Every structure is written in C-alpha cells, then in structure tokens.
C-alpha cells in the first residue's frame, strides 16, 4: 500500500469568485487571497455597486494598495449588472482591460443585491452585446420570489431563467457560480462549452445538517444556502470526476463577528485563510487528488481564455489549527473552520 503524499505541488491557483469588501475590511482580508492566488475574480457588490469603468479602476487600486509587498496578485474586476446599465460602458471597460466579466445578481438574492436585475428581459441588450464580445456572464443562480422555498431557489432558477436565457443566447459564456444542488451539477455537466461552474469549499464539505443540527452555526450560513447531503455528494462527485468546466471559486465573503452572531445574521463564509487546504482534503477523501491541480489552476484559465499562472504553490500534510478569530479594526472576523484542525496547509 502506497503511503499518502506529504506534499502537493500545484501550479499557482486562481480564485474565480471572491468578495474583498472595502475600507478596513478590505485591508484585513486581501492578504489572505493575494498570498495564495495569482488572480481573483472580484465581486462588484459593494454598498455602492461597481457599475462604471471609473469605479472599477478606483476599486482595483484600493485592492492593489492592500496587497502586501512580495505578493504577485492581479484582481480581475467585474461589472455589476443593473436594469439601467449602459452596454457601451461595459464594452469600453472590457476593451480597456478593466472588466473581465459581468455579474448578474437577481434583485435581493444576497448581500448588497438590491440594485440587481429585476428580469433578464430588462438587460437583454447588454447580454446580447456580451455574447457578441465574448464577455463572460457570472450568475448568482437563484430566484427570489417570496413563494419559492429557499432550498428550491437554485433548481427553479435553472428552469425559469438559466435555460431560457441560454436557449436564446446560445454563444453567451456563462459561469453558474457557487452551485449547490445535484440539479445544477447535472445541468452544467450536460451543458456545452459555453457553460461552467464554480464550487465553494463549504458546499463540498458540509450540508444543511452541519449548519442546523445541535444548534445553529451562523458561520456556515451562506447564500446559496447549504442543501441536503444528496446535493453535497453530487458536487463532490462532479469535482472528483475530473470534469473540466468546474473550477475553484471560494465565494469568500467576510462579515464582522457581530454581523454574523446576531438574531438576523448576514450570509457568507470567510474561507480565504483555509480554502485551498479544504479543497485538498475533499479531493483526497474522494481519491481524486489527480484532478486537484486542474480544478484549482487549469480549468478556470481555460474557460476564461487566460494564460495559466507560472508560479507554484505547495501544500503540506501538517495539521494546523485555524484561528478562532482575526482582528478587524474595532471588531473581529471568525474564519471558516475557526478553531478546527485541518490536515493540509499552504507552505509559507
């Protein structure tokens, strides 16, 4: 019997979905991403969403100002789609190398999404321009109708929004972000080369029992919400199969402790400090380490048409405890897996 690997060396990965926030929060969390990842797709859902080229340039500079010396990191900016967005502004940003993609948030689906799209028809001219130019559409795939159960939002979105959209714009590049259901896993698997998906570590590691049984665990609460174990298993099987249109997207989404541990807590897991090791643990459990590098470092660039990173990252089998909290101005952050011991960690 072969002894398990003690070191995993992979091409430097990218994070294809991250929230870096702004202000003191941004300064606190950026180094956890820039230390490990060569690039990251930065979500545009600030309190004042990123809808113009100038706003994206200014935000990118604030991110770069927070990157520690010695970190080689490129933030990839996204445009927040609204019903009133000017397609010419998006095209200009894309041609000038400011916007890498555009993000569709259904109105009120998640944090700072009140400015989001009320219907796909409202932005069809923008989407048609994106299809023509090859700009990827990043989708938070949930309906937000009051009569739809929160655990059914993703499956309903596929039937009522995603599939009609892709039938109408057959060459539009779409990333179905943070998929959480067997329905989405099968839908992406059955799709063509214009459809891909990101998957978070929390949706691979946990299901709704982990969040709700024996007491509510607010630091596992995110949107889309954790689902049944049958959905978790479908996601694990998808990545373990070596499927090439699924790739790393942490959806690391920090909120201060007092905004998570409250009677009406915010959605989001701050997983940047432990995400890569968490993914490695899942792939190891699934006997799929042969596909780990592709998921982290190859599949994303291939879909986006970008070069692979040239550097390397090593993970070592070295049990380490995740800190219980991280200082944040006059508050703190509780990271994903706080206080728990993980078996894979990034070599410093």
From Swiss-Prot:
Domain of life of the organism encoding this protein: Bacteria
Can you name the source organism? Answer: Salmonella typhimurium (strain LT2 / SGSC1412 / ATCC 700720)
Gene Ontology CC: one annotated term? cytosol
Q: Which PROSITE patterns match?
A: DIHYDROOROTASE_1, DIHYDROOROTASE_2
Q: How does it assemble?
A: Homodimer.
What is the official name of this protein in its record?
Dihydroorotase
Among HAMAP family, the record links this protein to: PyrC_classII
Which InterPro entries did the record assign? Amidohydro-rel (IPR006680), DHOdimr (IPR004721), Dihydroorotase_CS (IPR002195), Metal_Hydrolase (IPR032466)
Q: Does the keyword field hold Kinase?
A: no
Positions of Zn(2+) 1 binding? 17, 19, 103, 251
- Give the cofactor note: Binds 2 Zn(2+) ions per subunit.
Record field: transmembrane = none
GO MF terms on file?
A: dihydroorotase activity; zinc ion binding
Broad class of enzyme this protein falls into: hydrolase
Q: So what family is this one in?
A: Belongs to the metallo-dependent hydrolases superfamily. DHOase family. Class II DHOase subfamily.
